[in-house]
Amino acid sequence: MKLGARIRKIRMFRNITQKELGRRLGYGESSADVRIAQYESGQRTPKQETLIRIAEILEVDVRNFLSPGIATMDELMETLFWMDEENRGLFHLFLLNDSESEIVGITMRDKKTMSYLLEWMGKKLKLGDGRITEEEYLEWKLHWPEDKRKTEYKTV
């Protein structure tokens, strides 16, 4: 998801208007909503200091905006390819045996990454069986990683 779309999604999730966000960033009354609309549409890119302030206002981890983000499957594949170049043993690809179609599984030989994936899986399972709401799931993602990580997959 591109930066502007992330800003828009989180702003709307927080029930904040473009004008309100713009005013809280210090833009004038007449230009506040216009500036935010430009950020969200990709016409303008906020400076790093502005992104930090947007994250504070929207109460999310700033990494939601500062990390480059992967907007397409092609970009995801390129990222995985370069990670594979840096560490040839990191990924293990395999065909899932229980599938009638060709579905490829991927594991990463990195304990930290696996703990992240297990944590995510735990949240998705809770979402799937109704133990958490869509809002709670998004809220968790917006604040990930927490300073004191809780591995919830053990209680699933």
Walk through the language-model features, giving the residues of each.
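Short basic helix-loop element that most often maps to the first helix and adjoining turn
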Residues: A5-L25
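Helix-turn-helix DNA-binding elements, focusing on the entry/boundary residues of the two helices
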Residues: I7, Q18, D33, Q48-L51
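Recognition helix of helix-turn-helix/homeodomain-like DNA-binding domains
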Residues: G26-P46, S67-I70
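Charged, helix-prone or intrinsically disordered regulatory segments positioned adjacent to compact structured domains
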Residues: E49, E56-R131
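Short, charge-rich amphipathic alpha-helical segments embedded
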Residues: K148-V156
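Short, charged, amphipathic alpha-helical segments
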Residues: E134-L142
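Short amphipathic helical patch at the helix-1/turn junction of helix-turn-helix
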Residues: M1, M12-F13, T45
